[in-house]
Amino acid sequence: MSRESHRRDATAADGGPEASRGEMARYLQRAMDEVAEGRFGSAPPTESGWRRVGRYTRTGERIKDVLDRVLAAMGLLAISPVLLVVAVAIRLDSPGPAFFRQVRIGRNGLPFRFWKFRGMFVDARQRFPELYDYRYDAEQVRQLRFHPPLDPRVTRVGRFIRRTSLDELPNLINVVLGDMSLVGPRPEIPELLPYYGTQARAVLSVKPGITSLAKLLGRDNITFDETLELDLRYVRERSLRMDLGVLFGTVWMVATGRSIGG
């Protein structure tokens, strides 16, 4: 991070809440502009450099981890009635379990069991076989959008809980277990790791999160490549201010049904 960037951060902090909100809004807009113009990654640092640039200190990382777990545990208790209602709705809507568990890749490339509500039919592979059988080349993967608007695999309740992000609520279990953070790049499936470039693997140097800069700015409407670019920006510039901005922005996104990026 340049001295000028640090100076802007200090100026915003001195300006009070309004300055902080304005700084975050400008940051988010700048991020979207750079994605649109393809200006991300023009001079990427080394993989170890990503670890140095992030503005959390080692002590800050520990505090963040404790806060994540405490807030996630409190959140699970607070929303337990909602979890029960969603689980019952899923079971009544289609055969199969209420929860979906899948292996995802976490910090330092370690696999973990990922929890979310099931939003698809249990025979999803049979309903959309071409998605699983087709062999994409690297360029096709970079341009993929992984949530097609008319997906035959998704149930009626699944469409609702995906649109409202209720399907992600069980991710709080992963935060309590220490596999995930509240904010961070979304955890990847093992099959897509070969498509990550060397620099993009820096995304795995931090814990994956329930929400992310990419989810906030693009929700499900940006490509695999654009998601990676935003994840890399988060790894490079993450801080308490950014995490709070992403959290509050996510609440706004869920409430309005729109991403910050439009």
Predicted features and spans:
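Hydrophobic alpha-helical segments characteristic of transmembrane helices
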Residues: A43-P45, L169-V176, L216-R219
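A short, structured surface patch at a secondary-structure boundary
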Residues: Q140-K207, L247-M253
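Cytosol-/stroma-facing membrane-proximal "stalk/adaptor" domains immediately downstream
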Residues: P190-P208, L213-K215, R219-V246, V254, ...
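Short, glycine-rich, amphipathic interfacial segments at transmembrane boundaries or analogous
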Residues: F40, F99-P152, T211-E229
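Short, solvent-exposed loop/helix junctions and linker helices
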Residues: Y56, G60-K64, H147-D151, R162-L166, ...
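N-terminal hydrophobic signal-anchor/signal peptide
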Residues: M1-I79, R201, Y234-R236, I260-G262
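A hydrophobic, helix-centered structural microdomain
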Residues: R55-R127, L240, G245-G262
